């Protein structure tokens, strides 16, 4: 699991994964995750229980080690529950772009052959068509319902799927390794069809440490990633992985909204927000129209496209002088990362 402290086992000659989530449950009473949209918050204990319910539900449904849980979700609590559950159970979390067409969804389903597929009610029509196109059908298909919609025939609502599942830590009949595949991300397909990128447990642990060292990031921090969580930058650049690993708090932004982002910084005292340069441009425009108190920010982290000098100077003047710039956040994670003091002279 990526939620681990890696320690040497006295009963085996290899590194084993010891989950740090129970430690956070015992020592951290503050929120692990906040959904401003639904005005809901989860402590680490509550987050652990929700992840355990999904873990036990997929185990009861027959998933085995290495089985794939594919989910096409906007940023939402169920994304976090499923992501953690996969690490707990030795299964593979496979988040895919919620903007994919039916044909593209079918391609990823055929390629990864997921045991479990989770979709949002707003994508119901595309998913239903994809299931007809695909030559492979997942064993369990689950709908996250945001709109009171009826699920596709033969599928089940998420709330019903986990309703009777145990909130206790799952019992596994297999061992976990830091070299297990824990997450699979799909490329944009610029050289043909999308291709799955394997990310192992140790990849995710080291990505979390990278963030904790370079931001730096700790259990005192509160983050909000304004980008979708289905790519490396969304998950690992101040997203779910490093924030939960460090014991900080994730604030969910379902879909980017500049005015709401600034409001959440002020209301929830956020310390880090993450987005592409286009996001920073819209934040700057919104801040110039209606200024918010951004004094709690330790930094704004940008990625995804070049950061121009003149634009960077404007963002530093209007938002915060603490602008970070990373490169390589689609599937690989940073291969270049500039902290505020690393930026060229302005």
Report residues per predicted region.
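Flexible, low-complexity linker/hinge segments
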Residues: 11, 128-130, 149-181
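AMP-dependent adenylate-forming
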Residues: 19-43, 150-153
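Conserved AMP-binding/adenylate-forming core of the ANL superfamily
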Residues: 32-76, 80-84, 101-106, 110
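Conserved AMP-binding A3 loop
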Residues: 41-45, 182-206
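Structural core segment of the AMP-binding/adenylate-forming
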Residues: 60-61, 81, 88-160
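Conserved pre-ATP/AMP-binding loop-to-beta segment of ANL
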Residues: 143, 163-186, 193, 216-222
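Conserved AMP-binding/adenylation subdomain of ANL enzymes
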Residues: 205-222, 230-272, 282, 286-288
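Gly/Ser/Thr-rich phosphate-binding loop
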Residues: 270-275, 285-346
């Amino acid at each position: 699991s990526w939620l681990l402290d890696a320690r040497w086992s006295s009963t085996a000659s290899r590194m084993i994964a010891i989950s740090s989530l129970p430690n956070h449950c015992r020592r951290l009473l503050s929120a692990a995750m906040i959904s401003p949209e639904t005005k809901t918050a989860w402590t680490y204990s509550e987050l652990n229980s929700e992840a355990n319910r999904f873990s036990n539900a997929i185990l009861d449904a027959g998933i085995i080690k290495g089985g794939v849980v594919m989910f096409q979700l906007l940023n939402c609590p169920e994304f976090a529950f499923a992501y953690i559950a996969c690490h707990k159970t030795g299964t593979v979390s496979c988040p895919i772009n919620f903007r994919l067409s039916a044909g593209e969804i079918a391609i990823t389903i055929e390629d990864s052959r997921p045991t479990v597929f989770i979709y949002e009610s707003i994508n119901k029509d595309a998913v239903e068509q994809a299931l007809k196109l695909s030559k492979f059908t997942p064993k369990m298909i689950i709908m996250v319902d945001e709109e009171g919609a009826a699920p596709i025939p033969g599928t089940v609502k998420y709330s019903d799927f986990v309703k009777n599942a145990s909130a206790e830590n799952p019992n596994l009949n297999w061992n976990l390794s830091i070299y297990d595949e824990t997450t699979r991300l799909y490329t944009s397909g610029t050289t043909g069809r999308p291709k799955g990128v394997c990310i192992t447990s140790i990849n995710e642990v080291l990505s979390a440490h990278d963030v904790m060292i370079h931001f730096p990031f700790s259990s005192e921090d509160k983050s909000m990633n304004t980008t979708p969580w289905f790519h490396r930058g969304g998950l690992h650049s101040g997203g779910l992985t490093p924030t939960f690993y460090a014991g900080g708090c994730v604030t969910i932004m379902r879909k980017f909204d500049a005015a709401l982002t600034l409001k959440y910084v002020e209301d929830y005292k956020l310390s880090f927000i993450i987005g592409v340069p286009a996001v920073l441009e819209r934040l700057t425009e919104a801040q110039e129209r209606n200024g918010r108190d951004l004094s709690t920010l330790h930094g704004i982290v940008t990625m995804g496209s070049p950061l121009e000098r003149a634009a960077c100077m404007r963002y530093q003047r209007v938002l915060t002088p603490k602008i970070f710039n990373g490169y390589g956040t689609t599937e690989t994670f940073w291969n270049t990362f500039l902290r505020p003091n690393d930026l060229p002279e302005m």
